[in-house]
């Protein structure tokens, strides 16, 4: 398994956790999960061959969704946060 696949799997599992727990978890827990997703994205995007990776589009979609979700979490809009996460998961699946 390559580094990009590992980063994608870490991001995807983190986003699935977030999608299922936007309403029932503490803000700090959600921030930690989003931080883990963004750290995996940074690690993947720093790779030399990221531009040629088949995981480039899904990783980018999940990173964009995580960034938008973070903004909504900071504003206290958890339902919009969940919608962004689900949209990112949908985009990454294509």
Enumerate the language-model features and the residues they cover:
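Charged, low-complexity interaction regions
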Residues: 21-27, 46-54, 72-80
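A generic short alpha-helical patch detector that favors 3-5-residue windows
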Residues: 3, 29, 54-61
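Short terminal alpha-helical segments
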Residues: 1-27, 31-34, 89-93
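Generic L/I/V-rich hydrophobic alpha-helical segments across diverse proteins
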Residues: 8-11, 15, 34, 38-41, ...
């Amino acid at each position: 398994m390559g580094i990009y696949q590992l980063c994608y799997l870490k991001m995807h599992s983190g986003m699935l956790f977030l999608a299922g727990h936007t309403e029932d978890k503490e803000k700090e827990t959600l921030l930690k999960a989003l931080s883990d997703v963004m750290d995996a994205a940074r690690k993947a995007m720093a790779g030399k061959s990221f531009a040629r990776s088949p995981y480039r589009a899904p990783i980018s979609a999940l990173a964009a969704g995580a960034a938008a979700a973070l903004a909504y979490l900071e504003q206290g809009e958890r339902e919009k946060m969940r919608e962004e996460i689900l949209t990112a998961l949908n985009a990454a699946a294509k």
